Structures are given as structure tokens and as C-alpha cells.
Amino acid sequence: MKSNLKWTAVVSILLAALLHLPLAYAQVRTTSGAVSKSSGIQHPKELERRILQLTNEARRKNGLASLYPDNDLAAKARTKSDDMLMNKYFSHTSPDGKTLKDRFKEEKPAAFQTISRIGENIYMGARFDYFTDIKTQARMIVDGWMTSPGHRRNILDSNFTHLGVGVSAKDKMCYATQIFSQVK
């Protein structure tokens, strides 16, 4: 009986510790996102929506307007998350040296002219399907960004008006990217 109680206590402590790691351990439900047939990468739309919702809640709590969802920015955010996942890196600068501004200028130079400001938040975490639900995973991601000064600054930047969120998951990894913009 004592050994069962000790085992339960150890497991509870380990689970609580994992929940509070800087890179949140989280889940992506395969039923809530599209799967790329060629790569097996999942794009869980419900998680993306929840991250957007929680980001806007954080802004409203700080007296700021909500950000408008932007499908073009979301596509760029998914591409960034896919790139980090497939090329196994975690950085705002890709292995080929490209930054967010470089990617914008290359992909849609005309569209880039309508944007006066852009910003990017990125996340990488292990994925445990049995560990949390979508709401908890989104909360862990956004809370992590809110405790990081640079990421918090992006979320609470009053100049930003639009946001795209892109999440990519495969095997045991999950990457999320937020791209913020201010339209001229």
C-alpha cells in the first residue's frame, strides 16, 4: 500500500514538473487538423484558432484591440512551422539565413509594400497526445509567449492589427508560429 502511494506521488510530481517546463509539452489531435499526404505533417486548425483566441484575450486584458485573423499570414506561419519541423531547427532565422522580412520580400513583394511592420513568435514543444487537450496546449503556448519579454512585446504591440497562426506537428514534435502585421 505504501509503495503504491509513493508511486502515485512520484508520478504526480513528474507530471506537474513537465507541465511547467519552458517548452510546453502538448498534444495535437489528429482529428482537428489537415494532414499533408506527402510529409505526414499535421496542421491542427482548432489549435491555431485557440491560440488566436487566447492571444486576443491577452490583448483585451491589457486594453488593446483584438487582432484580425489573416489567412495569408496564417499560410506563411504554417510554412515557417513546417520548415522548422522538417529541417529540425528552432530559430527566427532559417538555416539558409532568411528572416521573416526576407521571406515576405521574396514570396510577395507587392504585398510586402502594404505592410509597415511585421513580427514573429515561434514555439517548439514535445507532443504527448495523452497529456493535455487542445485548450490546455494552446494555453501553455500562449502563456509561454507571455512570460518571454520579446514574445510578450509582439502580442501586446498596439501597432499590430493582423495575426496569422500556423501549427505543424509530426511524430512527437509540435511547432507553432505567429506572424503579426500592421497594414499601411
Which residues does each PLM region occupy?
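Short, well-ordered surface patches within globular domains
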Residues: H43-A110, R152, S158-G164
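Short, contiguous pre-domain boundary segments
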Residues: T31-I41
